């Protein structure tokens, strides 16, 4: 079939296998261009490894420091006549590139919240790697099936206390609209913390520790976003912020346990990027379009792969203990939060309208980046080619 993008809401329902592979190879090339990370990790588990920051972490570990990697994700394979998910094709592309270089790469496709998935990963580590020296936790899921009860809990993207009203971008019609989001109730807040907070990360770390598969000096990191006053009402001061605060709590608890073996756990606060997760949050597409324009003009723009390369090289594996903020977090959002960047952001925000959106923001860049997530718009890819949606690779299927 000839595969074209089909957009529904903030999701692209198709993905291009060759385009996704090309996207992965571009990221690999960037990591290699930065040189080898001499004292980087060697045996790495990435939970949430198929897109965005998780995929970028797996690529940096493997191609920046020659690490053996195990990636966990929940993705959909394709068939002859139907495309799979972008994360499936990304992971297949990663697997192929890793094998070409003789790097160990195993993938587990299943529910990362389940005890079965944890046990499968532990067995794999024991069998193939013995122990791991890094754990990356990068899950972005709207639902969590509780491992003990089977209860399905859903997260909510909502403000707390009062309705949220703001200008936002309708990315289907390319016009500005007023977004109105009603506030969350107590149950929705609690459920969002259960799904997107630090509880599951702790379950993973406890299970890995009890199984004896964490090496001395193991580094554990989970990813977060704080943002600015433009996004706080819907994000940091909303249900998601409560979940991310719980991630901070978990990091301190995990860090205390890992200290005994010379290890450490951190939350890394990252910059805003175009991901399948961020495109679902009202206001983020508009904010990202503005901040991209400013940061590109100043030569400080980063995508997922650049952010994680900087995290590894300058924070986690620089050879010295990394600087943290007052909450023990690693801050990679430092360039985005510079006063000059944010002040310009606010100025543009105040004057934005349907007529000047492409002039004042990088909305065209945002849209191109969004399509790239699904393998569309990459150089050197024949988008008129007749392709099968079926791509096989070395993956343990728990689905």
Curated annotation (Swiss-Prot):
GO terms for molecular function: enoyl-[acyl-carrier-protein] reductase (NADH) activity; NAD binding; trans-2-enoyl-CoA reductase (NADH) activity. The keyword Lipid metabolism applies. Its EC number is 1.3.1.9. The keyword NAD applies. It catalyses: a 2,3-saturated acyl-[ACP] + NAD(+) = a (2E)-enoyl-[ACP] + NADH + H(+). It is an enzyme of class 1 (oxidoreductase). GO terms for biological process: fatty acid biosynthetic process. Substrate binds at residue 225. NAD(+) binds at residues 48-53, 74-75, 111-112, 139-140, 244, 273-275. The record marks 75 as: Plays an important role in discriminating NADH against NADPH. Pathway: Lipid metabolism; fatty acid biosynthesis. The active site is at 235 (proton donor). Pfam families: Eno-Rase_FAD_bd, Eno-Rase_NADH_b, Enoyl_reductase. Coiled coil: none annotated. Keywords: Fatty acid biosynthesis, Fatty acid metabolism, Lipid biosynthesis, Lipid metabolism, NAD, Oxidoreductase. Involved in the final reduction of the elongation cycle of fatty acid synthesis (FAS II). Catalyzes the reduction of a carbon-carbon double bond in an enoyl moiety that is covalently linked to an acyl carrier protein (ACP). PANTHER family: ENOYL-[ACYL-CARRIER-PROTEIN] REDUCTASE [NADH]. NCBIfam families: EnoyACPredFabV (NF043048), PRK13656.1 (NF010177). Belongs to the TER reductase family. Monomer. This is Enoyl-[acyl-carrier-protein] reductase [NADH]. It comes from Serratia proteamaculans (strain 568).
């Amino acid at each position: 079939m000839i595969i074209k993008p089909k957009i529904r809401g903030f999701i692209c329902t198709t993905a291009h296998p060759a385009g996704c592979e090309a996207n992965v190879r571009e990221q690999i090339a960037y990591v290699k261009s930065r040189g080898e990370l001499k004292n980087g990790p060697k045996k790495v588990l990435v939970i949430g490894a198929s897109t965005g920051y998780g995929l970028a972490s797996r690529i940096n570990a493997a191609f920046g420091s020659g690490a053996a990697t195990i990636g966990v994700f929940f993705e959909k394979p394709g068939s002859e006549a139907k495309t799979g998910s972008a994360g499936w094709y990304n992971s297949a592309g990663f697997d192929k590139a890793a094998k070409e270089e003789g790097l160990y790469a195993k993938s587990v496709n299943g529910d990362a919240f389940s005890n079965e998935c944890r046990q499968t990963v532990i067995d794999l580590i024991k069998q193939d790697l013995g122990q791991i020296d890094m754990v990356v936790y990068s899950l972005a899921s709207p639902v969590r099936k509780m491992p003990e009860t089977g209860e399905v809990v859903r997260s909510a993207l909502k403000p707390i206390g009062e309705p949220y009203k703001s200008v936002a971008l309708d990315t289907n019609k390319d016009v500005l609209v007023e977004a109105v989001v009603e506030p969350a109730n107590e149950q929705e807040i609690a459920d969002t913390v259960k799904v997107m907070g630090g509880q599951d990360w702790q379950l993973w770390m406890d299970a890995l520790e009890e199984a004896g598969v964490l090496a001395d000096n193991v580094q554990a990191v989970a990813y977060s976003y704080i943002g600015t006053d433009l996004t706080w009402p819907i994000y940091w001061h909303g249900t998601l912020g409560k979940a991310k605060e719980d991630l901070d709590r978990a990091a301190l608890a995990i860090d205390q346990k890992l200290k005994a073996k010379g290890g450490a756990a951190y939350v890394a606060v990252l910059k805003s990027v175009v991901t399948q997760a961020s495109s679902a949050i009202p206001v983020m597409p508009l904010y990202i379009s503005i901040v991209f324009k400013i940061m590109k003009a100043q030569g400080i723009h980063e995508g997922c792969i650049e952010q994680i390369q900087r995290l590894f090289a300058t924070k986690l594996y620089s050879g010295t203990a990394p600087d943290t903020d007052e909450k023990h977090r690693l801050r990679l959002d430092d360039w985005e939060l510079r006063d000059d960047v944010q002040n310009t952001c606010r100025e543009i925000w105040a004057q934005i309208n349907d007529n000047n959106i492409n002039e004042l923001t990088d909305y065209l860049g945002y849209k191109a980046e969004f399509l790239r997530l699904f393998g569309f718009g990459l150089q050197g890819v024949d988008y008129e080619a007749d392709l099968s949606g079926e791509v096989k690779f070395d993956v343990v299927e728990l689905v």
